[in-house]
Each structure stands twice: as structure tokens, then as C-alpha cells.
Amino acid sequence: MAFRSDCAIIGACGSKGQKSERMTGMEQMRRVRTTLKDIANACGYSVNTVSRALRGDKRLSKATRSLIQETARSMDYIPNTMASSLRSGRSRMIAVIVNDLHNQHFCDLLNRMDRDLRDQNYNLMILCMHLEETLAGELIHTAISLSVDGILYFPNFGQRHYIEYMTDSGVPFVLLDRRVNEVDADTVRCDDEQGGYLAGQHLAALGHRRFLFLSGMELSSSQIDRLSGFRRALRDSGLPDDCVRVVPGADVEDALAHNTLASFILPRDYTAIVSFRDEVAYPVMNALRDHGLSIPQDVSIISFDNLHAEDPSRPFLTSIYAADENIAEISVRLLLERIEDPMLPPRNIVLPVRIFDQGTTAPPPRA
């Protein structure tokens, strides 16, 4: 960005009528920024002592640390993180590479991760693939080139080659939310197969015999496992495989984009709907009501993610999930442990899920 040589910064020059030296914008910015030397002069300590106090060096007395830190705050001191990184070998920066920021589930996780990382004096950098798998390698390269201390990675459709790239680079990382076969790496995810099973078991126990399953993206491990668990529950309940009509994830997303959900919710050859995620279930509920159908009196619906827990303004929806705070807390802990000890054996954490029953399922209507 170019700066005008005559740009004004309030308080940088003398009052009207006073003679002042003319400075460029860059010079003004340099003049304004407080340095360690400025703090040292104000406190009467050496630059080295000031630096140690701002790092929280407990070999200095608490009174000395407090005085220097308060002086730095009053002078609006901004630390030079790049210089600190060069000295310590740590950037205190964690990159999170996520598939889609439109997905509220991801946003809730990012919010909790940021909070947990800040508690450990780390900053979070968000890099998004925007549903473009080919961007993953570029974003991983960007994160590594910026010397992040670690990566929290939401793999999309497996992406073993990108995971191998991170392994070869030596950067600590944790995989989240997806199962990636034949990869030895720290992983934190929900038990999606169990989640699908719970959905099928719950609906079958209510007496449902005909189902509509609205899928996620075809190659997603979550989609594969949830549908597998759902079908297993129906088989265990004595129901045939053809009692489920499965709508592919690509068709679901297309219907959402073009407001054509009626194309697969009608004709109604089902009494219960299973949605891959809540953000699909909500517009489906609206479409059902637009066609004069009541939930759960006419149609039961169950989904995954439990977004209502994070945003109570959302409608009630029976949903399956493990708590977001558990996923965020565990993934951050595993990554920080990996940063401290790169030789730890890989940990694979699979969190149990449960049904959050919020009144959108009931026995099917009588014929």
C-alpha cells in the first residue's frame, strides 16, 4: 500500500503556527510505534530487562514485571512477533485448514478452538478450501511457509497425499472430523457409524418403516459411516434394505441452491427423514410445512450436528452429535502435546455421540 507523503496523523505534528519537521507516512508510523528502548527509558530499566519482563520471566520480581508490563500497556506497545519467533523458534501461530466456512458446525468448532488456543497464548490462522479440494495443498504450503507451530486440518474426501505432505514436512498436525484410512496420525472425530445407527434404531423403535435419507458429499467418510450405521440399525430391526430412499449429496446441495427441495420430499413415500446435517434439515422442515405437513405428526425428522445447542434461536430439531467443546478441547490438547513431543505415538480419538431429542420425531401417522 502506498502512503501519501503529506498524510496526517493526529498528534504527530505540532499545533497550528508551530514549526514542525515534515515526515512521510512511513516515518510517522515508525515514530508512533513504541519500542523496547522507549519502555526502558520510561521505566529506568535496561532493554534486556524490559524484554524479559514482557516475556513473563519469573526470575524478575513480580513488582518489576508488573511495572514494566503496565508501562508497556500505557504506551500502546505492540510486540514484534516476528523477532520473537526468530529468537524462540516458535511463532505461537496455529493454522486451521477447513473445507467450508458456510458450514455452521465448522464455525462453532473454530470459535472454541480459538478460545482454547488463546488460553495457551497461541493465535489462530484460518485457511479455507471453499469446497475446492485442489486448494488443500496450496493452503498447507502457505501455512508451513508462514512457520506456523502446528496445523489443525479438516480433511476433505480423504486427501492422503496432502497428509503425507504434512508428515514429510515435519509440521505437527491433527486431523479432525473425518476418518482417513491407512494414515497414522493424530485424529479427533465423532463416531459417525454409531450416530447413523442411533438414528435408525430411534426411528425404527418409534415404528417407522419407510425412510428418506438426505446424504452428504459422496466420498465423505462421515457420509459413508452414517449411512452404513443407519442401514445396520434397520437390518437389526428386521427391515429390508429397500425401505430407504437415498438422495445423493450433490442432488441435495443443488436443490438447496435452487430452492427445489420439493423435487425429492414429494411424493411422500416415507414417514421419517434422516438429514446428513442440520443446515440441510432446517430448510427441509420449512419445505414440508409449506406443503401442509406437520412435524412430527406427519413426518419425523432427525439430523446431525445439534446446532441448536450453539444457537438457541434456531428451531428445535432432534439431532445427533458429540459436544463441540470436547472436539475443540481434545484437538487443541493433542496438537500442543505433539508440538512439545514430536515422537509421541499417533492418537486416534473417536468420540461417542448421543441423540439430543428436541421433539421432531414421533410414531408414524396411522394409515
Where are these regions (language model features)?
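Alpha-helical recognition/docking segments in bacterial nutrient-uptake
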Residues: 2-31, 89-201, 205, 261-267, ...
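N-terminal helix-turn-helix DNA-binding module of bacterial transcription factors
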Residues: 2-90, 366
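Flexible loop/turn connectors
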Residues: 5, 259-367
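Short beta-strand segments enriched in small/hydrophobic residues
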Residues: 42, 47-52, 86-102, 202, ...
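Short acidic/polar active-site loop segments enriched in Thr and Asp
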Residues: 46, 149, 208-210, 271
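Hinge/beta->alpha junction and helix N-cap segments in small-molecule ligand-binding domains
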Residues: 98-108, 126-135, 178, 188-198, ...
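Short acidic capping loops at alpha-helix termini that bridge into adjacent secondary structure
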Residues: 209-210, 241-244, 294-301
